[in-house]
């Protein structure tokens, strides 16, 4: 475990001067090319469900020189520079931006593909983004300014690797708790419980159909993490919903995404 994780122990509340809070803000720094970051996104989806009244999550593409250089090296234009593309997607809302980056990651991580304009165009469409607005936003001056803001935030929080999560309570005088790397789900729930400092009533996930309708686009890995079902049972339930014409499997990328049919 990292030094940050070791700060939280069963009897550490008094030492850390932690008092009960009602809301935690989590900054999630990710590398779009990282398999660990892709796995963490499913864990964060589960946290959002169970602790939705206690946490808010802000995703930030890690603006390190290494990540931005890789984004630039793999691009032929601003459209397929994933750092700029993600910022443009964000201007159309957090949910659509997250769908967009999940689609891109599912293309480039399992198959180790190079990002192309056609790939990005497909992901824009499947994420429900407005293509013309997206292109306009790519040329907006506020886009690179927004990247500079992310860079400032990352430096202030001393982010050195991705994935990294930084947990903040409501006390502006308290430093954030940084957790670098990928850990089992129960580690993150333990941190949330320690920071809240009072009894937490976790929410149960909605029905599988309702969750897919809410999110519009999901990965099977995300569903397996959230529902903790055997994969055989999950496949059966997904097939049942597909036969009922309530969801459909995306032909690309790799059929690992399921989309609600409206």
Swiss-Prot record:
Its main location: cytoplasm. The keyword Cytoplasm applies. SUPFAM superfamilies: Thioredoxin-like (SSF52833). Keywords: Cytoplasm. GO terms for cellular component: cytoplasm. Adapter protein required for efficient degradation of Spx by ClpXP under non-stress conditions. Interaction with Spx stabilizes Spx and exposes the C-terminus of Spx for recognition and proteolysis by ClpXP. This is ClpXP adapter protein SpxH. Transmembrane segments: none annotated. It comes from Staphylococcus saprophyticus subsp. saprophyticus (strain ATCC 15305 / DSM 20229 / NCIMB 8711 / NCTC 7292 / S-41). CDD domains: DsbA_FrnE_like. It is found in: Cytoplasm. Belongs to the SpxH family. Interacts with Spx. InterPro entries: Adapter_SpxH (IPR046404), Thioredoxin-like_sf (IPR036249).
